[in-house]
From Swiss-Prot:
Catalyzes the formation of N(7)-methylguanine at position 46 (m7G46) in tRNA. It catalyses: guanosine(46) in tRNA + S-adenosyl-L-methionine = N(7)-methylguanosine(46) in tRNA + S-adenosyl-L-homocysteine. Belongs to the class I-like SAM-binding methyltransferase superfamily. TrmB family. It is an enzyme of class 2 (transferase). Disulfide bonds: none annotated. The active site is at 155. This is tRNA (guanine-N(7)-)-methyltransferase. S-adenosyl-L-methionine binds at residues 80, 105, 132, 155. The lineage of its organism: Bacteria, Pseudomonadati, Pseudomonadota, Gammaproteobacteria, Pasteurellales. The keyword Plastid does not apply.
Amino acid sequence: MTEQKITFADQKRKTVEIAEFTEDGRYKRKVRSFVLRTGRLSEFQRNMMNNNWATLGLEYQTTAFDFTQIYGNTNPVILEIGFGMGKSLVEMALQNPDKNYLGIEVHTPGVGACIAYAVEKQVKNLRVICHDATEILQDCIADNSLAGLQLFFPDPWHKTKHHKRRIVQPHFVEKIQQKLVPNGFVHMATDWENYAEYMLEVLTSAVGLRNTSATNDYIPRPDFRPLTKFEQRGHKLGHGVWDLFFIKNIT
Protein backbone atom coordinates (compact mmCIF):
# COMPACT_ATOMS: atom_id res chain seq x y z
CA MET A 1 0.00 0.00 0.00
CA THR A 2 1.41 3.41 -0.95
CA GLU A 3 0.14 6.93 -0.55
CA GLN A 4 1.51 9.96 -2.38
CA LYS A 5 1.59 13.44 -0.95
CA ILE A 6 2.79 16.16 -3.29
CA THR A 7 4.16 19.40 -1.88
CA PHE A 8 5.90 22.14 -3.84
CA ALA A 9 9.38 22.90 -2.46
CA ASP A 10 9.75 25.90 -4.78
CA GLN A 11 8.42 27.22 -8.07
CA LYS A 12 10.54 24.97 -10.24
CA ARG A 13 10.17 21.58 -8.65
CA LYS A 14 7.96 19.45 -6.47
CA THR A 15 8.77 16.87 -3.86
CA VAL A 16 6.87 13.61 -3.76
CA GLU A 17 6.76 11.76 -0.45
CA ILE A 18 5.82 8.10 -0.77
CA ALA A 19 4.79 6.38 2.45
CA GLU A 20 5.85 2.73 2.51
CA PHE A 21 4.15 0.08 4.63
CA THR A 22 4.98 -3.51 5.58
CA GLU A 23 2.85 -6.40 4.33
CA ASP A 24 0.81 -6.33 7.53
CA GLY A 25 -0.01 -2.65 7.03
CA ARG A 26 2.43 -1.10 9.51
CA TYR A 27 4.12 2.18 8.59
CA LYS A 28 7.73 1.63 7.48
CA ARG A 29 9.20 4.93 6.25
CA LYS A 30 8.82 7.81 3.85
CA VAL A 31 11.01 8.06 0.80
CA ARG A 32 11.47 11.49 -0.72
CA SER A 33 12.02 11.67 -4.44
CA PHE A 34 12.80 14.63 -6.67
CA VAL A 35 10.23 15.15 -9.41
CA LEU A 36 10.52 17.95 -11.91
CA ARG A 37 8.05 20.12 -13.74
CA THR A 38 8.31 20.26 -17.49
CA GLY A 39 9.75 23.47 -18.87
CA ARG A 40 13.15 24.50 -20.15
CA LEU A 41 14.68 21.26 -18.93
CA SER A 42 15.61 18.82 -21.64
CA GLU A 43 14.27 15.31 -21.29
CA PHE A 44 17.84 14.12 -20.72
CA GLN A 45 18.41 16.63 -17.89
CA ARG A 46 15.09 15.75 -16.31
CA ASN A 47 15.89 12.04 -16.36
CA MET A 48 19.39 12.59 -14.99
CA MET A 49 18.02 14.58 -12.07
CA ASN A 50 15.25 12.15 -11.27
CA ASN A 51 17.55 9.13 -11.52
CA ASN A 52 20.51 10.58 -9.60
CA TRP A 53 19.04 13.01 -7.08
CA ALA A 54 19.25 10.45 -4.28
CA THR A 55 23.04 10.28 -4.59
CA LEU A 56 23.96 13.77 -5.85
CA GLY A 57 21.17 16.03 -4.64
CA LEU A 58 20.36 17.55 -1.27
CA GLU A 59 17.12 19.09 -0.03
CA TYR A 60 16.76 22.25 2.00
CA GLN A 61 16.20 21.55 5.68
CA THR A 62 15.86 23.63 8.82
CA THR A 63 18.80 21.96 10.58
CA ALA A 64 22.49 21.92 9.69
CA PHE A 65 23.76 19.35 7.23
CA ASP A 66 25.87 16.52 8.63
CA PHE A 67 28.68 16.61 6.08
CA THR A 68 30.38 13.50 7.47
CA GLN A 69 27.20 11.52 6.91
CA ILE A 70 26.51 13.09 3.52
CA TYR A 71 29.96 12.51 2.02
CA GLY A 72 31.04 9.53 4.09
CA ASN A 73 34.27 11.22 5.17
CA THR A 74 35.67 14.21 7.05
CA ASN A 75 37.32 15.93 4.08
CA PRO A 76 37.03 19.74 3.90
CA VAL A 77 33.85 21.08 2.30
CA ILE A 78 33.87 23.87 -0.27
CA LEU A 79 30.61 25.63 -1.11
CA GLU A 80 30.00 27.20 -4.51
CA ILE A 81 27.03 29.52 -4.95
CA GLY A 82 25.57 29.90 -8.44
CA PHE A 83 27.46 27.26 -10.40
CA GLY A 84 25.62 27.91 -13.67
CA MET A 85 25.73 24.79 -15.83
CA GLY A 86 28.17 23.21 -13.40
CA LYS A 87 31.02 22.26 -15.73
CA SER A 88 33.77 24.05 -13.80
CA LEU A 89 32.38 22.84 -10.46
CA VAL A 90 32.46 19.22 -11.62
CA GLU A 91 35.98 19.68 -12.98
CA MET A 92 37.18 21.08 -9.65
CA ALA A 93 35.61 18.18 -7.78
CA LEU A 94 37.23 15.76 -10.21
CA GLN A 95 40.65 17.37 -9.78
CA ASN A 96 40.40 17.44 -5.98
CA PRO A 97 39.12 14.08 -4.71
CA ASP A 98 40.42 14.95 -1.23
CA LYS A 99 37.86 17.77 -0.97
CA ASN A 100 34.07 17.72 -0.89
CA TYR A 101 32.09 20.18 -3.00
CA LEU A 102 28.60 21.52 -2.42
CA GLY A 103 26.95 23.56 -5.16
CA ILE A 104 23.89 25.79 -4.97
CA GLU A 105 21.99 26.83 -8.09
CA VAL A 106 18.39 28.03 -8.54
CA HIS A 107 18.36 27.53 -12.32
CA THR A 108 17.00 24.02 -12.70
CA PRO A 109 18.46 23.30 -16.18
CA GLY A 110 21.87 24.19 -14.75
CA VAL A 111 21.36 21.70 -11.94
CA GLY A 112 20.36 19.07 -14.49
CA ALA A 113 23.41 19.76 -16.64
CA CYS A 114 25.70 19.63 -13.60
CA ILE A 115 24.32 16.30 -12.45
CA ALA A 116 24.61 14.87 -15.96
CA TYR A 117 28.26 15.92 -16.20
CA ALA A 118 29.00 14.61 -12.69
CA VAL A 119 27.52 11.24 -13.61
CA GLU A 120 29.51 11.17 -16.86
CA LYS A 121 32.74 11.87 -14.96
CA GLN A 122 31.77 9.53 -12.10
CA VAL A 123 32.30 12.26 -9.51
CA LYS A 124 31.52 11.13 -5.97
CA ASN A 125 32.60 14.14 -3.88
CA LEU A 126 29.89 16.54 -5.09
CA ARG A 127 26.36 17.37 -3.96
CA VAL A 128 24.01 19.99 -5.38
CA ILE A 129 21.03 21.94 -4.06
CA CYS A 130 18.32 23.78 -5.98
CA HIS A 131 17.32 26.40 -3.45
CA ASP A 132 17.91 29.98 -2.35
CA ALA A 133 21.53 30.39 -1.20
CA THR A 134 20.77 32.75 1.67
CA GLU A 135 18.39 30.26 3.25
CA ILE A 136 20.91 27.45 2.82
CA LEU A 137 23.61 29.52 4.52
CA GLN A 138 21.27 30.53 7.32
CA ASP A 139 19.69 27.17 8.10
CA CYS A 140 21.68 24.31 6.58
CA ILE A 141 25.35 25.23 7.07
CA ALA A 142 26.80 25.04 10.57
CA ASP A 143 29.17 27.73 11.78
CA ASN A 144 32.86 26.92 11.31
CA SER A 145 32.10 24.08 8.90
CA LEU A 146 33.23 25.29 5.45
CA ALA A 147 36.79 25.22 4.15
CA GLY A 148 35.91 27.70 1.42
CA LEU A 149 33.26 29.70 -0.41
CA GLN A 150 33.33 30.18 -4.17
CA LEU A 151 31.25 32.77 -6.01
CA PHE A 152 32.10 33.02 -9.69
CA PHE A 153 30.46 35.51 -12.05
CA PRO A 154 27.32 36.32 -10.08
CA ASP A 155 24.68 38.55 -11.65
CA PRO A 156 26.25 42.06 -11.52
CA TRP A 157 22.94 43.94 -11.48
CA HIS A 158 24.86 46.71 -13.21
CA LYS A 159 22.19 49.42 -12.92
CA THR A 160 22.77 51.54 -9.82
CA LYS A 161 19.16 51.21 -8.70
CA HIS A 162 19.58 47.42 -8.75
CA HIS A 163 22.84 47.24 -6.77
CA LYS A 164 20.89 46.30 -3.66
CA ARG A 165 19.98 43.04 -5.41
CA ARG A 166 23.60 41.93 -5.66
CA ILE A 167 24.32 38.87 -3.59
CA VAL A 168 27.55 40.39 -2.29
CA GLN A 169 26.50 42.63 0.58
CA PRO A 170 28.07 43.25 4.00
CA HIS A 171 25.55 41.01 5.76
CA PHE A 172 26.19 38.23 3.22
CA VAL A 173 29.95 38.36 3.80
CA GLU A 174 29.39 38.42 7.56
CA LYS A 175 27.32 35.25 7.26
CA ILE A 176 30.03 33.60 5.16
CA GLN A 177 32.64 34.42 7.80
CA GLN A 178 30.55 32.63 10.41
CA LYS A 179 30.42 29.49 8.28
CA LEU A 180 34.14 29.35 7.45
CA VAL A 181 36.71 27.50 9.52
CA PRO A 182 39.82 29.49 10.52
CA ASN A 183 42.03 29.86 7.43
CA GLY A 184 38.99 29.15 5.27
CA PHE A 185 38.85 31.11 2.04
CA VAL A 186 36.48 33.34 0.10
CA HIS A 187 37.12 33.28 -3.65
CA MET A 188 35.07 35.56 -5.91
CA ALA A 189 35.41 36.40 -9.58
CA THR A 190 33.57 38.76 -11.92
CA ASP A 191 33.95 40.23 -15.38
CA TRP A 192 32.31 43.53 -14.35
CA GLU A 193 34.88 46.02 -13.06
CA ASN A 194 32.35 48.01 -11.05
CA TYR A 195 31.19 44.85 -9.29
CA ALA A 196 34.82 43.83 -8.69
CA GLU A 197 35.45 47.18 -7.01
CA TYR A 198 32.35 46.72 -4.89
CA MET A 199 33.35 43.16 -3.93
CA LEU A 200 36.78 44.45 -2.93
CA GLU A 201 35.24 47.21 -0.82
CA VAL A 202 32.88 44.85 1.00
CA LEU A 203 35.47 42.13 1.60
CA THR A 204 38.12 44.61 2.72
CA SER A 205 35.69 46.16 5.19
CA ALA A 206 34.90 42.79 6.74
CA VAL A 207 36.67 42.38 10.06
CA GLY A 208 38.45 39.04 10.21
CA LEU A 209 39.22 38.58 6.50
CA ARG A 210 42.67 39.04 4.99
CA ASN A 211 43.34 39.84 1.33
CA THR A 212 45.95 37.51 -0.20
CA SER A 213 46.66 39.86 -3.11
CA ALA A 214 50.24 41.14 -3.25
CA THR A 215 48.83 44.48 -4.39
CA ASN A 216 46.01 44.42 -1.84
CA ASP A 217 43.32 44.22 -4.49
CA TYR A 218 43.01 41.39 -7.05
CA ILE A 219 44.92 38.21 -7.85
CA PRO A 220 45.67 36.61 -11.24
CA ARG A 221 43.29 33.79 -12.11
CA PRO A 222 44.62 30.78 -10.17
CA ASP A 223 45.26 27.59 -12.10
CA PHE A 224 42.81 25.69 -9.90
CA ARG A 225 39.86 27.77 -11.12
CA PRO A 226 38.75 26.41 -14.51
CA LEU A 227 37.75 28.85 -17.22
CA THR A 228 33.98 29.20 -17.25
CA LYS A 229 31.81 29.90 -20.27
CA PHE A 230 31.05 33.32 -18.75
CA GLU A 231 34.74 34.10 -18.57
CA GLN A 232 35.28 32.98 -22.15
CA ARG A 233 32.36 35.16 -23.20
CA GLY A 234 33.89 38.08 -21.34
CA HIS A 235 37.21 37.64 -23.09
CA LYS A 236 35.47 37.69 -26.46
CA LEU A 237 33.73 40.93 -25.51
CA GLY A 238 36.98 42.47 -24.38
CA HIS A 239 36.04 42.38 -20.71
CA GLY A 240 38.60 41.96 -17.99
CA VAL A 241 38.21 39.39 -15.23
CA TRP A 242 38.91 40.12 -11.58
CA ASP A 243 39.61 37.44 -8.97
CA LEU A 244 39.50 38.16 -5.24
CA PHE A 245 40.87 35.72 -2.67
CA PHE A 246 40.50 36.38 1.05
CA ILE A 247 41.36 34.20 4.06
CA LYS A 248 39.56 34.07 7.40
CA ASN A 249 42.00 35.02 10.13
CA ILE A 250 42.71 32.71 13.05
CA THR A 251 41.40 34.30 16.23
